[in-house]
A protein has these predicted regions:
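N-terminal hydrophobic targeting signals that begin at the initiator methionine
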Residues: 1-4, 107
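Membrane-proximal helix-loop-helix interfaces that form the catalytic/acceptor-binding platform
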Residues: 18-338, 350-518
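N-terminal membrane topogenic signal
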Residues: 4-15
Length: 519
């Protein structure tokens, strides 16, 4: 008994150390980087109080973001230091996710609890979400808390746990609609048997849980339904394809285990788990809980003609089960091949490889910006002249610039851009601004900007790498600035969304820019 107590005490101390290290890794530089585009949406959505949120959603019931996270972050309004204040909530819940995954993993097997916590603590992907003014770290915490009480109910059959499961799952719904597949399909766990002595769950428990979830979510569902009057759900400017099922699945694996050798090892472990495990039904259920939400989202995208990319962040609630399943598979592998345990511990080796793979990219992540709109706006305000044209591509970049220019939003949480039909298949979007008495124009168009060059205007271009290369084929532009965004958690982690600032100045055609090639 004394030995067990010492083991528990040592594991508890290791967990405390793990949480402290995790906090330090998430706190470091968390408020130093410029907002990227999605964070700018968040801070704009967080300015309204509860009354303001209700009014906005009444007018915009199909808005794709649920309101709870905005209401929580509003408590830090008026955001005296926005880059810090908006990221405090994700930082807190990102850190709390470490002990939460430990508690959840312990429900499946005590031997995988600490490995799961260690893997998450050093995971650069999760560190980035904990420093991101979005709801993903909160979502993961709420999902793990709901799963924890779900398994506790399966173990004990106590009805009180169902209320807690319903509360956490309902908070998931109010935080992000992307959690709906997880809420629905994680209930495959009703067939999971956590121990030999666990009673078989009753159908009444299933009805109680789902009745409570429906009861808690119904007010918002009715509110949205009552105020829906045929508004469009998807922004018509979003034309991205979600991709094939294989593309989405690879994206999830790529982001969660980063490097190809680890991706291959993880896939093999997931495949071998039902074969090696003594409890095959449980193994298949865990795998289904991870894979089915991805399948569900893919089917939804195909049936609804969903025009948006699908990222691993949409499946953040499944990530804890993913790591738990990997370590359970490693447990089964070690039991099956006990002879090899004398030479090396496969679970220990896998943890080392996971941590090492993340430590390789972590310094690069810390040095890089998310999407440096702040630096871009500061540069432009120092060099802009009266009559200048600022051409932005893609159009969404306008929002980032206007935020850091200090331009206010309309009541519809959008910027009032002028729209002008310049040809049968092209519209120009523009806004005129004043800075220190200088009037200039920020605009987006596909090709109409060529006219400004032909008219002899001084034209700036704020573009991504691909567009910068294309424009340079036709005009000898000067590269005036590079604004880093090389390690952003966007479609993939990392995604390079760096911006290039080019200048066409007819009065200084030979002007030199920064010594950097666009490659």
């Amino acid at each position: 008994m004394a030995i067990k107590d010492k083991v528990r005490e040592r594991e508890f101390l290791l967990l405390i150390l793990c949480v402290l290290v995790a906090f330090a890794l998430r706190f470091y530089t968390f408020d130093k980087k410029s907002f990227w585009l999605d964070e700018i949406y968040t801070i704009e959505d967080s300015r309204d109080d509860v009354k303001g949120q209700i009014k906005f959603y009444k007018d915009n019931p199909t808005y794709l973001q649920a309101p709870l996270f905005f209401m929580i972050t509003h408590q830090l309004y008026p955001f005296t230091k926005p880059e810090r204040d908006l990221r405090i909530i994700p930082l807190v819940f990102g850190t709390l996710s470490i002990p939460m995954i430990y508690l959840l993993a312990k429900q499946f097997s005590p031997s995988v609890a600490l490995p799961s916590a260690l893997s998450l603590a050093f995971m650069t992907y999760h560190i980035s979400l904990s420093q991101d003014g979005r709801s993903y770290s909160l979502l993961m915490f709420l999902g793990m808390a709901g799963l924890y009480f779900f398994i506790k109910h399966l173990e004990t059959s106590k009805s009180g746990y169902l209320l807690l499961v319903a509360l956490f799952f309902s908070m998931l719904f109010y935080t992000s609609y992307s959690s709906i597949p997880f809420i629905a399909l994680s209930q495959i766990l009703w067939f999971y048997k956590p121990g030999e002595v666990a009673k078989k769950p009753t159908f009444s428990s299933f009805l109680i849980l789902n009745g409570l979830i429906l009861l808690f979510c119904l007010p918002w569902i009715l509110f949205v339904a009552i105020n829906y009057r045929g508004q469009t759900i998807m922004d018509p400017l979003h034309l991205e394809s979600p991709g094939s099922f294989g593309y989405i699945l690879y994206g999830v694996l790529h982001d969660w285990v980063l490097h190809t050798p680890l991706i291959i090892a993880s896939v093999l472990l997931l495949i071998l788990f039902p074969i090696l495990s003594k409890f095959r039904r449980n193994a298949f259920i865990l795998l289904a809980t991870i894979v089915f939400p991805i399948v569900g989202v893919y089917i939804f995208c195909k049936l609804s003609d969903f025009s948006h990319f699908v990222t691993s962040r949409y499946f953040i609630n499944s990530m804890s089960l993913f790591f738990i399943t990997l370590f359970l598979s490693l447990n089964a592998l070690e039991v099956k091949f006990q002879t090899f345990r004398r030479f090396f511990r496969m679970k220990f080796l896998f943890i080392i490889l996971l941590i090492a793979s993340n430590l390789v990219i972590l310094p690069i992540y810390y040095r890089s910006e998310k999407q440096d709109f702040r630096g871009l706006a500061n540069y432009l305000t120092g060099h802009i002249r009266a009559g200048d044209k600022v051409i932005v591509s893609p159009k969404l970049y306008i929002r980032g610039l206007l935020y850091y220019f200090g331009i206010g939003l309309s009541e519809s949480r959008d910027y009032l851009l002028s729209q002008r039909r310049v040809s049968d298949d092209e519209t120009e979007y523009s806004i005129s601004l004043f800075y220190k008495g200088n009037k200039f124009t920020v605009s987006h168009s596909k090709t109409y900007w060529n006219r400004y060059i032909a008219e002899g205007n001084r034209v700036w271009f704020v573009v991504d790498k691909k567009t910068a290369k294309e424009i340079n084929k036709f005009y000898p532009l000067t590269l005036k600035g590079y604004f880093d965004g090389s390690v952003l958690n966007l479609v993939r982690f990392p995604t390079d969304v760096s911006m290039y600032l080019l200048l066409w100045d007819p009065e200084a055609p030979g002007e030199k820019g920064i010594n950097m090639s666009i490659e």
